[in-house]
Amino acid sequence: MANTKKTTLDITGMTCAACSNRIEKKLNKLDDVNAQVNLTTEKATVEYNPDQHDVQEFINTIQHLGYGVAVETVELDITGMTCAACSSRIEKVLNKMDGVQNATVNLTTEQAKVDYYPEETDADKLVTRIQKLGYDASIKDNNKDQTSRKAEALQHKLIKLIISAVLSLPLLMLMFVHLFNMHIPALFTNPWFQFILATPVQFIIGWQFYVGAYKNLRNGGANMDVLVAVGTSAAYFYSIYEMIRWLNGSTTQPHLYFETSAVLITLILFGKYLEARAKSQTTNALGELLSLQAKEARILKDGNELMIPLNEVHVGDTLIVKPGEKIPVDGKIIKGMTAIDESMLTGESIPVEKNVDDTVIGSTMNKNGTITMTATKVGGDTALANIIKVVEEAQSSKAPIQRLADIISGYFVPIVVGIALLTFIVWITLVTPGTFEPALVASISVLVIACPCALGLATPTSIMVGTGRAAENGILFKGGEFVERTHQIDTIVLDKTGTITNGRPVVTDYHGDDQTLQLLATAEKDSEHPLAEAIVNYAKEKQLTLTETTTFKAVPGHGIEATIDHHHILVGNRKLMADNDISLPKHISDDLTHYERDGKTAMLIAVNYSLTGIIAVADTLKNHAKDAIKQLHDMGIEVAMLTGDNKNTAQAIAKQVGIDTVIADILPEEKAAQIAKLQQQGKKVAMVGDGVNDAPALVKADIGIAIGTGTEVAIEAAGITILGGDLMLIPKAIYASKATIRNIRQNLFWAFGYNIAGIPIAALGLLAPWVAGAAMALSSVSVVTNALRLKKMRLEPRRKDA
């Protein structure tokens, strides 16, 4: 191979020499590729022709064989970005680097997230590459107080703005002279006075624009700094030219534009300050989550209570929490009982009763009892830490709707500069032939009215505020793409057990005396069946004392038979009673039929061969399940139930909550296929589940929604997590998505519309440069302000919300 390149990849999943040989053989089948795979080091070294192949092709080949390639992720803080052209350029350069799988740069958060192959590159190389582009970059420090850093930066912007405004205000008065024929002191019209005021604004306050423009042009790019630097420099240096003519006596009335350059810079700084201030509010939701974390814990060591910093708590430590204190970390109660306010997690204001062996979540509030607990999850593994991580990732992610804005931003500045040059040529040759000033003013107006910032901020600000507001309500979107996809959903499929129902059977009906119940519970107490557990718990709630069984026998398919204190007990169905010649009165038979029709498991009880009672057990509906289904129907969304239960039970539950479509008797492995069937009908499907067996269906669906009380596998497979299991959050999640996407469209319409309309108006000479500059400064502020409206959105779905 004449032109060769070498790359090394870390491979995961190899177990023997056959694995490494298989990968090596497959890679070497590619044209002009020489690959060696080492099982011991778990690395593949590949020499290849870069004109024919790239690293991603080798990764796809390895993954297609069923193995993985190690990928690491790093988050970087970037400062110095001024508009969408900056973030687009950094993103493009990072994605072209060897070893980078994917890089996204968020202008709003001023952060980059990069997935890379550690054998090809590292975080330091990424930082260095960004710095070469002219921006400051560093690896994100999670322990660093980002809020105070941003507050300092905002304060610095304000100081520069004030200084610039003080120097520009006298120059601004000159504009009023031209506009309103006002009289002002002669000093204000003196060229030297104007020069002294404008120069520090241009080259000290405005130096940042020159630096930004130079760095971008040096690296073959162009951003907002280029537009500002060129536009203000044109006005400033033309004024210098006129001033020299005045000093030489060539003119007694120089046409100076010092006020244009200085006021433009001041207005742009004002817009940037307002933008930064508004952007800081977009992360309020994350700041509020961070503020929920406990700062210290009371640990029990050698019989003594000690207060220690939260970061010193380890798994297995014994902690004491008193009334009014926050639970420091996730754990399990080993002593005491209390009520816990979990509203920060679930949004539910009513405290939850907690006893020994119950789990407690870090940062929730202990209301009224002292408890002793064992720490089970600490640091970054706690529930709150995971919530914060999901919200951070969602806020820094990109929605597919942003792609068009990103593409346009990359070409925006060169196009605007070209339009400005064309404007100058047309004016000086056709509109006002040979007259320099009108051509200059029109071209400056074109340069300064164009705003790539609004394009870059349109989507990420809405995503940040929208996902933050959703998180405050217990709805966690994993990323911008899930926000965008959710608004398209027209069909929602709900798992039954643990999703629509509580997943814990309870006694719903009982007819009989306490003695019969005591004997029944005693007979069932050694069984691990959920129905037996429900009966035993019911008896304990009645404070009945359970004794011991003398004999016990299960009657397969029919029930049980037991002897307790010389009493013969039969518990089961009609067949069991009939086999023992026990007749059923009509009202008992009718009750049995009624319970079965309602999807309940009904059991007859006979003591000493006489019917003494009937009991019904069922998995109860979750609170608000019926209301949630109704809201989804009101939004025009079809709702279906998917369950492995028999059709009668499923139909009974569906009838109670108002679900029309029931898919029952489904094996766990068939759930994903049922989702695919609905998708083949052209439906956009969301699957809601909580168990391990729901994970394939959650992945297959257009959107997977996991119930937060469910398994980690289900939560990992889903794009949205509903904290606490309240089904009312499902229509709220869909509404949050719709409201956020609607807000993004408004922003994009404004950003595109502003530039499409503003640039031609400026080119026609209908706007003074300072008016154009003010419009540019306020355009990005308006986009951020519109996004901030989402902070106040009430997550109340509308009927058939579009």
Curated annotation (Swiss-Prot):
GO terms for cellular component: plasma membrane. Its EC number is 7.2.2.8. One of its GO terms (molecular function) is P-type monovalent copper transporter activity. Mg(2+) binds at residues 690, 694. The keyword Chaperone does not apply. It is a multi-pass membrane protein. It is found in: Cell membrane. Keywords: ATP-binding, Cell membrane, Copper, Copper transport, Ion transport, Magnesium, Membrane, Metal-binding, Nucleotide-binding, Phosphoprotein, Repeat, Translocase, Transmembrane, Transmembrane helix, Transport. The active site is at residue 495. Gene3D superfamilies: 3.30.70.100, Calcium-transporting ATPase, cytoplasmic domain N, Calcium-transporting ATPase, cytoplasmic transduction domain A, HAD superfamily/HAD-like. It catalyses: Cu(+)(in) + ATP + H2O = Cu(+)(out) + ADP + phosphate + H(+). GO terms for biological process: copper ion homeostasis. Residues 5-70, 72-138 form the HMA domain. The keyword tRNA processing does not apply. Cu(+) 2 binds at residues 83, 86. Cu(+) 1 binds at residues 16, 19. Its main location: membrane. The chain crosses the membrane at residues 161-181, 192-212, 224-244, 256-276, 411-431, 438-458, 748-767, 771-790. Involved in copper export. PANTHER family: ATP7, ISOFORM B (PTHR43520), P-TYPE CU(+) TRANSPORTER (PTHR43520:SF8). Belongs to the cation transport ATPase (P-type) (TC 3.A.3) family. Type IB subfamily. This is Copper-exporting P-type ATPase. It comes from Staphylococcus aureus (strain bovine RF122 / ET3-1).
